Amino acid sequence: MYKTLKTIYKKSKIITSIILIIFTLQTKILFAQNNSNNIDTSDLKEIINLVEKNKLNKAIQIANKNNSVDLINLINWIYIFTENEIEIEELIKMYEKFEDWPKANLIKVLIEKKIGWESNNISHYQFINENKPVSALGNIKLANYNFKSIDMKQIIINNWINNSFSKNDEKFIMSNYKNLFDNNIKYKRLDYLIWNKKWSSAYRQLKEINSDYSNLYKARIKLSRKEYGVDAAIKKVPEYLINDEGLTYERVKWRRHAKLSSSLDMLSNYLGKNEKLKYKEKWWTEIIIHTRKLLKEKKYLEAYNLLSNHKQTNTYNLSRAEWLLGWIALTHLSKPKEAQKHFSNLEKIVNMPISVARANYWLAITEKELDNNALANEYFEKAAVHNSTYYGLLAEQAIKKEGSINFINLQSKNIIYEKNESIFYSLRLLARANEKKYSAKFINGLFQQNISEQDIINILKIFEEEKRPDLLVKACKKAVRLNIKFQNCLFPYPNNIKINEATQYIDTALIFAIIKQESEFYTGAISRAGARGLMQIMPFTAKITAKSLNIKYDKDKILSDAEYNIKIGSKYFSQLYQEFDNSIILSIAGYNAGPANVRKWLKIYGDPRNEEISYINWIESIPFSETRNYVQRVIENYVIYQKVILNNRINSLKSINEIINNG
């Protein structure tokens, strides 16, 4: 009884708090002047902290003190993303208020979860009738409410197959609509659940199928989860199901992890069949890992043949496959005509500056190999248009052309509101709070909406004014996908970062180049691996480097003191630079992947310092996709930060050719 009363009391407090927020918001709109520009950073941080802890009354008190409508809006918006319990009626009010805000669909998802299966409240079902459901659960609940037509039955079936649900929701769906789900539908759903590692739902679904298919799916689960008894489980799978796509995929992956060479044979044989892959993207990981392994073993034709059967259709994987096929054909098989086909295919399907420059650069190299110099120059010209990218810069040097970069001058732009201006005021407050979590959600949500060029300029200008180069870079990366001219906004000058002593180890432009790629200039960055701060230093590396500097090691300071972080990171890079005989490229690779990996790659792929291999091909030989991308991005960052942003403070600029040719 006590617990029930306590729960009711807690819920009533939450409802009261939300009503108070909404009431305060309405009165502020009527009577308050906007005061967002004067809000203190410490107040913003405290408000976010209070909202996360469900202390709404205290958060409102601070908002009232600041007399800001936007702050009240922001409290409401952040509250949606906390794990605090919100009643359905309040969620509906919130959706009505924030329908045009970033991530508003999350409110709909929460509402759809809370609507009862047998709710007597017609208004709840009217809401999802009028506001198209965004979740599978919402679609099934709406179909359940309107369950009269064949269409509604099909909606239930389609959403059931390709989604997972809570145990209680599954129980209701199964008890009411089991007659809709024949064996084929049950198999399809279990197939989906295992591919997507939804184990709890998969185990429940296993109880609904016959023994043959049960044995198949049990074997797949054991393989995927690396459980004991894999061989015995596979033996129980009947012969007519042994070539199931999901089972073959899991067997290939399991054998690769076990370092068994038979994984390649199984993969090649399955891809060689004329069968469509249902989960092409999942297969891509296995294909590319095995291809790179074959390249490492210098089995170039075998690598080419395996990759030729990739069967990828999404643009990202298809472009990666076409590029690598072209590169293998050109550099390892001496088949420029074959390479030409692949690079042409690549050029037709890409539109992002980095990829367009890459495709045209390699087309140019291929045409040179075929003695088509005039055509090669045309492709170099096309690549050089994108001269803030790695291959664009290389193309520019190849034709001895140095074009200017048309940076967008945000200072000359005006903020003009084409949509709810409160959204932009709230974005400014988040930027000022010097936090990343909610800012990132806000940015992602904005770019998922129908966003105009002026909206993008507003966003970027706000981040520039609030001295948040990290958020500016994040937003620019999104903006480039909508309009490639924003590529030239990707290199902000970080006025809020002090370099000072670090320049005695490496130059300022290189420091900025590394920081931009490591943390995007966010001082509070912590990676999943534990790397910390602007230069993303691992604590163990920082400890050793601090000792070499004769300074005290302080783990907390790596994160809290940007200058300390940069000093240690720069010193560590300079040590790599010495180890690799003043090779910038090898040092960059070592900074990302560790010097031990670089030493290993030099033995496997050749040493560009001894001209055993060109630096360009050595970089493309790196087996880690993250490191390949990292090296290219840091090099382009380095050139741009020298060439444009730091031009007045550098006596001589290193071109990309100098960096590449001298390592």
Where are these regions (language model features)?
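Residue at a conserved register position within TPR or TPR-like alpha-solenoid repeats
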Residues: 50, 115, 146, 193, ...
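TPR repeat positional signature
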Residues: 43, 76, 108, 139, ...
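Solenoid-like repeat scaffolds
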Residues: 35-36, 60-69, 81-84, 93-101, ...
